[in-house]
């Protein structure tokens, strides 16, 4: 974890964010950035995918994402839950890498789906609000099932 501070949002204080990039799912910013979307005061702490931004709502402390800079969608109930979910994801994929790949393609598809189901169950267990259709973790779960993280 890395601690970031923001002079522009002293109410936020110091926040601990995951220190390193996690595939295309998460990349930390070098410095916190303040933004305003939908009348919400947000602090960007990371990136996701090619164009997405991960942000903390200063009022609710929820983690949100935006891909267009004009609307946001829910990711996690808090930065702590986000970090736990991200660590679960990393640990899950690390276990697969250590075990090695499947013998044939059909077996790989079954293993990818089983891995995706474990990811979904883990995310739901950490933050019950985080996994829902068309959400950040939903999209990652489906990418895992398709073998994008194999």
Question: In which residue ranges do the predicted regions lie?
Answer:
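Conserved aromatic-histidine-acidic binding/catalytic patches
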Residues: 48, 70-74, 111
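Compact, glycine/acidic-enriched structural inserts
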Residues: 64-101
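A surface-exposed partner-binding patch
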Residues: 1-68, 116-150
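Mixed-charge (acidic/basic) macromolecular-recognition segments
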Residues: 86-135
């Amino acid at each position: 974890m890395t601690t970031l501070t923001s002079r522009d949002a002293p109410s936020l204080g110091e926040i601990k964010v995951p220190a390193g990039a996690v595939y295309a799912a998460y990349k930390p910013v070098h410095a916190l950035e303040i933004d305003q979307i939908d009348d919400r005061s947000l602090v960007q702490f990371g990136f996701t995918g090619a164009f997405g931004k991960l942000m903390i709502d200063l009022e609710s402390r929820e983690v949100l994402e935006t891909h267009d800079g004009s609307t946001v969608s829910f990711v996690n109930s808090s930065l702590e839950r986000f970090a736990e979910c991200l660590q679960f994801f990393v640990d899950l994929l690390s276990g697969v890498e250590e075990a090695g790949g499947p013998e044939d393609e059909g077996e790989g598809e079954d293993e990818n789906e089983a891995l995706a189901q474990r990811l979904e169950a883990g995310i739901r267990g950490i933050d019950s609000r985080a996994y829902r259709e068309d959400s950040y973790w939903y999209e990652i779960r489906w990418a895992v099932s398709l073998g994008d993280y194999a």
